[in-house]
Amino acid sequence: MKFSAPVLAIFLASASAQSTAELAAQIPSCAQTCLATAITGAGCTAGDYACQCGTSQNTITASATPCVISACTSEEALNTQRTTSQICALVAAGSASSPSASSSASASASSSASSTSGAASASASASSSASSASAAASALTLAHPIPNPSHPPSPTIQTNLRKKVRNSNRLTPASLSSVSSALVSSASSVRASASSAVSAATTAANPAATTAAGVKEEASFFIPAAVALFAVFAV
């Protein structure tokens, strides 16, 4: 069993007010020793109700509760809880009528107002931060939009992709070098054949010279054609 009242620890040997004395008389005898020990341990005296119901209240309650539970019946423990609560209520009512108590109440109200204001400011700051984060996320999405599969690339992008594919299918530098070497070799062979034919034509009859001239013309035609073919492959 655990007490929920603010005070379980008031032991009254004497009282300065009749109402407080009447309440003190209602505390079960089984709880008085427990309360007296807890009050002394907290640094208060038996008749110092301001101390017992003030800053030492939690200490007295924590110390007296286990003792009261073990020493009293459930009914007696409940009566102790109810009576000590009423005594502290009378102490609080008497303190509230003094100027110092009014000052304390005002300070407490001011502190509560400050706490409320601080909480409101923190809430506004958090809301502002959330708005800023949302705006930043929107700006990032606009600057770097996520591709949408339902919207195909624009015609310009498709054209660029086709160019890249077409360029990738062209001859590589190694292939172009091989083709160039083959064309040069073929041209050299034709040129050598033409030269041999011309030399033979100078010592042979006119029909042979005519044949050599024809071979030379074929060689002259083949070489430019080979160069043109090489240019086509190089594109």
UniProtKB/Swiss-Prot annotation:
Domain of life: Eukaryota
Keyword Zinc included in the entry's annotation: no
Role: Appears to function during host infection, and may play a role in suppressing the host immune response.
Name of this protein: Effector CFEM1
Gene that this sequence comes from: CFEM1
Domain remark in the UniProt entry: The CFEM domain is involved in heme-binding and contains 8 cysteines and is found in proteins from several pathogenic fungi, including both human and plant pathogens. The CFEM domain adopts a novel helical-basket fold that consists of six alpha-helices, and is uniquely stabilized by four disulfide bonds formed by its 8 signature cysteines.
Cystine crosslinks: C30-C72, C34-C67, C44-C51, C53-C88
The keyword Transmembrane is assigned to this record: no
Lipid-anchored residues (GPI-anchor amidated threonine): T211
BP-aspect Gene Ontology terms: biological process involved in interaction with host
Pfam families cross-referenced by the UniProt entry: CFEM
Single annotated GO MF: metal ion binding
Coiled coil: none
Induction info: Induced during infection of poplar leaves, with highest expression observed four days post inoculation.
Protein family per UniProt: Belongs to the RBT5 family.
UniProt entry keywords in alphabetical sequence: Cell membrane, Disulfide bond, Glycoprotein, GPI-anchor, Heme, Host cell membrane, Host cytoplasm, Host membrane, Host nucleus, Iron, Lipoprotein, Membrane, Metal-binding, Secreted, Signal, Virulence
Chief site of localization: membrane
Residue numbers covered by the propeptide annotation in the UniProt entry: 212-235
Domain CFEM: 18-114
Binding site for heme: D48
Membrane topology label: Lipid-anchor; GPI-anchor
